[in-house]
């Protein structure tokens, strides 16, 4: 059918699609026949074989039979492929007098879409007898009527058609009349009574005859009516209609009691024989219910609403009768003019309420449209909104399929309300709309998406195991199981990272937990990837990076690297009494395993044998003289340096230093024990003797050890090795503190030469031998620093 109206540009591609679609429609219909009144469930044909389809294909492709009208009178057995009757078929009810009686149907298959046209011819059986509308007919004939005159009689009706329909009329045997069966222009057979010889009222004033209507069935059926013939006195002229037939057109929406037409008949006789009255002649019940005629004026009035869609024209026979009983016949042909009073109809044959989002060209609905009006009033345009991903495909006989134009996206729109509009081309235009709701079923086409591509989590060290340290979150735009997200830890890229023992993740909610207590000093940070997978088929997944930064806590106290805190052999620093204020005695070197401000170290002098003599620089731990030394200052000093970090709460450590004041580096010295209490000096002479004896013995042993050490040093030509002046207790020459105060500023070396004279028993230190002390500066020449010549500094 040619589609009228505006064609949207977006629909121009439909022409090609339509050509492809129509190629799936079988144009030549398959034809079957069945006798009317056949029992329901009766076999009609083996449809699958006739269509060249396998029996299993009918079920797999959802084959079904669609009829042109609203009733489904046929059914398809998908298991056997047989076409069966759903109900008894009454040809007279379905088609009336129309012959042949054909029931049109379509066979629809999906995947791919195919249409097959079918026609079922309903064959008539002789199940109706001819019936006359009245039981008796009164016929008045003038006695001067001539032989050969025809007198119309009542028509019998037979609902059967063809050979089973009305074929002829007969009348009971008599000598004055016989029946002539004639064919009307409408195809009906009319009986006319033919006069065979003159009549004589005085001889026989009345005849009673039986009119028989016979059909052509086997055996034939018949109907009868009694015909009474009255012989009338002479009335020379019968009424004659001025115009016959009359033709008139009436709008189907004309109001009741509207005048249709006025007929006029004249009788040239005088008196009562010239008086004419009008009436309906041999009118059917339908005509009697629809029209009436004024007996005096001959005006035909409308008694019942007209309906063009049911009856398009009426043939009304009018009889004009004079006072003498003569009558004339006239015909009025009333044509009903169609008006656009029927909106289009939309009949849905198949509807799919849910379709998958990834299936283009999916059939959503199959429907047909019709308009009971005619002409332009019956032409229709079917459309849907342009902004929907659906298209209408016309098939045949006003059948349409609604299919998806492209793959749908449930996440964009999970439901579509489609309004199918059918508009006729009448004036005014009438429209019918049908709303269809289509649910889009989800397909797993969206992977879970993390809210962030990377997450940074902070965990303070020494945490409790199973501590919740953070969460990751991913969402999936799908629905149902396709949107259920499961979290997991992915294998780390670093094979040495024991991820399985560090963290775990809750698979349901993405919460991350620390499995053990973390130690900043062992592991400052680590990163890993987490995965989020949905439960679709196949499952989709995504990844995100998680960085875990371990926050330091002040859980490490400062550790003193130098001087070594060895209680058995403490280090002793030598300071010449001639040292200037600010003289560097030594440097306390400490480290802290923490970081940040927890590792910022500060130094302070906690205890001193003589307060005010020495000072400690707070930032670098350098111990320097605070003033000039004097002879009154004690020779031995004990300093306790406190090293404290900047944590909260702060942690600390102490370093004990022994300082020995010497007049010159040539005099012997030994680390002396702690000063005796004041009360222990009572007997000074005894103490001096004991000390002298111990000193001589110790010096001897010490001298031997020094001699051996010097020999070894000379052989190995070791450069500078910072050592305490006491045996044992070596320490490294360069130390680094984490607070940024640097290392020991210098490296120093010295030699001690020991000579002994057995005759005198006197030890003498030789003048110390020093290498040139060099001061190096980046980018400068190396120069000798004379300031340190012939001086000894211990660090």
Curated annotation (Swiss-Prot):
InterPro entries cross-referenced by the UniProt entry: Cadherin-like_dom, Cadherin-like_sf, Cadherin_C, Cadherin_CS, Cadherin_N, Protocadherin/Cadherin-CA
This protein's UniProt keywords: Calcium, Cell adhesion, Cell membrane, Glycoprotein, Membrane, Repeat, Signal, Transmembrane, Transmembrane helix
Protein known as: Protocadherin beta-4
Membrane side Cytoplasmic: residue ranges: 711-795
Segments on the Extracellular side according to the record's topology features: 28-689
GO cellular component: membrane; plasma membrane; synapse
TM helices/strands, residue ranges: 690-710
Residues of the Cadherin domain: 34-132, 137-241, 246-346, 351-450, 455-560, 567-670
GO biological process, one term: nervous system development
Chain segments annotated as coiled-coil in the UniProt record: none
An example Gene Ontology molecular-function term: calcium ion binding
Gene: PCDHB4
Subcellular location field: Cell membrane
Entry function: Potential calcium-dependent cell-adhesion protein. May be involved in the establishment and maintenance of specific neuronal connections in the brain.
Glycosylation sites: 183, 417, 435, 566
Signal sequence interval, chain numbering: 1-27
Primary residence: membrane
Membrane topology: Single-pass type I membrane protein
A Pfam family hit: Cadherin
